[in-house]
């Protein structure tokens, strides 16, 4: 009985508040902008490459594990808070669990198991996603600079002359990447500015064209600071680092125009460092390269900064 003579339990208001909080959380969850088709993807974009479903599956598994862990931890916290809070009528010392070896072992082993499982799946998928053993059908040198993008299409195109393996503008790219370049690839390029817009969609930034169903290798270089190359529906991004060359491969399997952006804060106009990716048929892709050559955009724009300092010793052009 409470001091004022009422027999109303003090726990009832707490339970009522908890029920109200759970109801509000359910309303907020159902009021999001996601459709029922988006829920299995947890709000992530629809994959448009052969590699993207692996990334989506990794994220789904990680979020499911995090949610299960969170529900367990939150449940224990709420359970202890609601049902084991200090009594107003009894003063007693709660049971002590110090030096309880089974409980302490459980606290240690369970987190280790969770981390080990997450590490295994992450390492397994990362090794597959970054595997460059397959020879690419198309190679594109993506050049990041403040504050736009350049795209060097390393291809044999009618009207272009030169050799990508010896071109001075590509000197910053290590030889281990040049080995996969086509022989005598004169190449064509496209380059944007922060004010560039796609004439068809009016989306900001230059447009990178890719052929559907072909393995595309991106060789990422920077002229100035660290950028990050992110095509949103690819579900993958990679840093573009001055003095260090990164690379990954994808196989687009869906035609369309997709948005890309720099995902690394790189200066005042970082927010304008946008681009588009247009996936088309292989025939339309080849025609686009010929159109660039007719415009006089043959050869290559400077790829970036040559590797220096300890990076030069670790990964040189002679590898």
Swiss-Prot record:
Record-linked InterPro entries: CcO_II, CcO_II-like_C, Copper_CuA, Cupredoxin, Cyt_c_oxidase_su2, Cyt_c_oxidase_su2_TM_sf
Enzyme class: translocase
GO biological process: ATP synthesis coupled electron transport
Binding positions (Cu cation): 227, 262, 266, 270
Localization annotation: Cell membrane
Keyword list, A-Z: Cell membrane, Copper, Electron transport, Membrane, Metal-binding, Respiratory chain, Signal, Translocase, Transmembrane, Transmembrane helix, Transport
Membrane topology: Multi-pass membrane protein
Signal peptide boundaries: 1-33
Enzyme Commission code: 7.1.1.9
Cofactor(s), names only, from the UniProt record: Cu cation; heme
Main location: membrane
GO cellular component: plasma membrane
Matches recorded under CDD domains: CuRO_HCO_II_like_5
Catalysis performed (reactions): 4 Fe(II)-[cytochrome c] + O2 + 8 H(+)(in) = 4 Fe(III)-[cytochrome c] + 2 H2O + 4 H(+)(out)
GO terms, molecular function: copper ion binding; cytochrome-c oxidase activity
Short name of any one Pfam family annotated for the protein: COX2
Record's cofactor remark: Binds a copper A center.
Transmembrane regions: 63-83, 101-121
Role of this protein: Subunits I and II form the functional core of the enzyme complex. Electrons originating in cytochrome c are transferred via heme a and Cu(A) to the binuclear center formed by heme a3 and Cu(B).
Family that this chain belongs to: Belongs to the cytochrome c oxidase subunit 2 family.
Listed PANTHER family: CYTOCHROME C OXIDASE SUBUNIT 2, CYTOCHROME C OXIDASE, SUBUNIT II
Name recorded for this polypeptide: Probable cytochrome c oxidase subunit 2
Organism of origin: Streptomyces avermitilis (strain ATCC 31267 / DSM 46492 / JCM 5070 / NBRC 14893 / NCIMB 12804 / NRRL 8165 / MA-4680)
Lineage: Bacteria, Bacillati, Actinomycetota, Actinomycetes, Kitasatosporales
Gene field: ctaC
């Amino acid at each position: 009985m409470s001091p004022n003579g009422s027999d109303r339990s003090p726990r009832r208001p707490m339970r009522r508040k908890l029920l109200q909080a759970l109801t509000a959380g359910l309303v907020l969850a159902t009021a999001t902008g996601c459709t029922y088709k988006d829920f299995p993807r947890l709000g992530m974009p629809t994959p448009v490459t052969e590699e993207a479903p692996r990334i989506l599956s990794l994220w789904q598994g990680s979020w499911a594990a995090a949610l299960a862990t969170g529900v367990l931890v939150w449940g224990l916290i709420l359970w202890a808070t609601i049902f084991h809070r200090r009594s107003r009528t009894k003063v007693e010392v709660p049971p002590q669990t110090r030096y309880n070896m089974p409980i302490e072992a459980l606290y240690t082993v369970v987190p280790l198991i969770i981390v080990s499982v997450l590490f295994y799946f992450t390492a397994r998928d990362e090794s597959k996603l970054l595997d460059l053993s397959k020879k690419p059908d198309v190679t594109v040198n993506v050049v990041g600079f403040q504050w736009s993008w350049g795209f060097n299409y390393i291809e044999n195109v009618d009207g272009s002359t030169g050799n990508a393996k010896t071109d001075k503008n590509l000197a910053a790219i290590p030889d281990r990447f040049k080995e996969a370049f086509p022989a005598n690839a004169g190449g064509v390029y496209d380059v944007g500015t922060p004010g560039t817009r796609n004439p068809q969609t009016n989306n900001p930034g230059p447009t990178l064209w890719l052929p559907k169903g072909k393995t595309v290798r991106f060789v990422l270089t920077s002229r100035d600071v660290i950028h990050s190359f992110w095509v949103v529906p690819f579900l993958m991004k990679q840093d573009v680092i001055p003095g260090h060359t990164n690379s990954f491969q994808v196989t687009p399997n869906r035609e369309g125009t997709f948005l890309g952006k720099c995902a690394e804060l790189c200066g005042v106009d970082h927010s304008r460092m946008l681009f588009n990716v247009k996936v088309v048929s292989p025939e339309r892709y080849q025609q686009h390269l010929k159109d660039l050559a007719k415009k006089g955009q043959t050869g290559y724009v400077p790829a970036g900064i040559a590797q220096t300092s300890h990076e030069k010793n670790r990964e040189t052009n002679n590898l």
